[in-house]
């Protein structure tokens, strides 16, 4: 996701950072020699030089967003260079300090990786020429810089606290079975595959929920609702269709249960891994069964609805 900033001088306010006062006079001549201190103090000059380095003198500069907010590249440039530059920040593991200058949502667990990526893409050249005061001819490519920094820090998240319980992550469901789901989750730059399962309630857990009077009342109400639901269950209603994974799970569960007696969690995880390792042709065998079961369910539901409609009509006539 990106945000159009046109012209770049729209960022007309910069808070004093590291002792540098704010000075937002517009620079009308990009050919005027500039120094690092000038870019720090003058945000308009910073944006003009950045556009020139990116070759966007006549185009709109698309500034990236992080956590739903536009990333302040000027602030990022100051925070990194004031700590010795990108190489020093990575080597000394100072990304946490840099991130502290921004108000990112707590759900972002890969902020250091994201900031490093955008710094290399947008600001690496400015640092090389204006902060390190090296000639443009000695500037290595962004890809080479990325490889070099990767060797310095094999873990892009170094210096960042580990994700805590309660963090939100994005993902999708690959398959469903009786005890849970096969899922793929995205955590920063990593893509993780696993099993999301429901832990069955044990008798000891049930006993704990009934230790207080309020728990007894709630438990009684739940039992009452459960009995009410059981009382209205239609035993003639067709059994819901199953997916290809459901057929695979049932087959493997019956095979593994004697070997892993009482280890429901282990069985579930093992079957999930087995399904993930199947080839597409092997999965297709079970998916075909799922397609047939969907058709079975459709036909049985038509018959079920037809019989109920005829029964309701007969009841109305009798009245």
UniProtKB/Swiss-Prot annotation:
Presence of the UniProt keyword Repeat in the record: no
GO molecular-function term, one example from the UniProt record: DNA binding
Cellular component terms (Gene Ontology): nucleus
Limits of the ARID domain: 40-131
Coiled-coil boundaries: none
PROSITE patterns from the UniProt entry: ARID (PS51011), HMG_BOX_2 (PS50118)
Biased composition (Polar residues): 1-13, 203-220
One Pfam family per UniProt: HMG_box
Entry keywords, A to Z: DNA-binding, Nucleus, Transcription, Transcription regulation
Region (Disordered): 1-25, 203-230
Residues in the DNA-binding region annotation: 238-305
SUPFAM superfamilies according to UniProt: ARID-like, HMG-box
Tissue expression: Ubiquitously expressed.
Subcellular location: Nucleus
UniProt-listed InterPro entries: ARID_dom, ARID_dom_sf, ARID_HMGB9-like, HMG_box_dom, HMG_box_dom_sf
Described function: Binds preferentially DNA with A/T-rich content.
Name assigned to this protein: High mobility group B protein 10
């Amino acid at each position: 996701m990106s945000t159009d900033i046109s012209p770049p001088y729209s960022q007309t306010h910069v808070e004093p950072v590291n002792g540098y006062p704010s000075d937002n006079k517009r620079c009308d001549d990009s050919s005027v020699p500039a120094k690092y201190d000038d870019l720090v103090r003058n945000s308009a000059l910073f944006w003009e030089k950045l556009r020139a380095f990116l070759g966007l003198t006549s185009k709109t500069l698309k500034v990236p967003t992080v956590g739903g907010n536009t990333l302040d590249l000027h602030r990022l440039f100051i925070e990194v260079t004031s700590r010795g530059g990108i190489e020093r920040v990575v080597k000394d593991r100072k990304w946490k300090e840099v991130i502290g200058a921004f108000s990112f949502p707590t759900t972002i667990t890969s902020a250091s990786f994201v900031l490093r990526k955008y710094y290399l893409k947008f600001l690496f050249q400015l640092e090389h020429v204006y902060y390190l005061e090296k000639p443009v001819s000695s500037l290595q490519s962004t890809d080479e810089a990325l490889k070099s920094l990767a060797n310095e820090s094999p873990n892009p998240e170094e210096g960042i606290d580990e994700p805590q319980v309660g963090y939100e992550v994005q993902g999708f469901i690959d398959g469903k079975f009786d005890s849970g789901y096969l899922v793929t989750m995205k955590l920063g730059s990593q893509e993780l595959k696993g099993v999301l399962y429901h832990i069955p309630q044990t008798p000891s857990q049930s006993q704990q929920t009934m230790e207080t009077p309020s728990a007894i009342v709630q438990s009684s109400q739940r039992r009452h609702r459960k009995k009410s639901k059981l009382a209205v269950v239609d035993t003639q209603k067709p059994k819901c269709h199953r997916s290809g994974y459901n057929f695979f799970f049932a087959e493997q569960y019956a095979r593994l249960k004697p070997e892993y007696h009482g280890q429901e969690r282990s069985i579930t995880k093992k079957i999930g891994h087995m399904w993930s390792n199947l080839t597409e042709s092997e999965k297709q065998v079970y998916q075909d069964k799922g397609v047939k079961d969907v058709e079975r369910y459709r036909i049985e539901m038509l018959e079920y609805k037809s019989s109920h409609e005829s029964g309701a009509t007969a009841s109305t006539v009798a009245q």
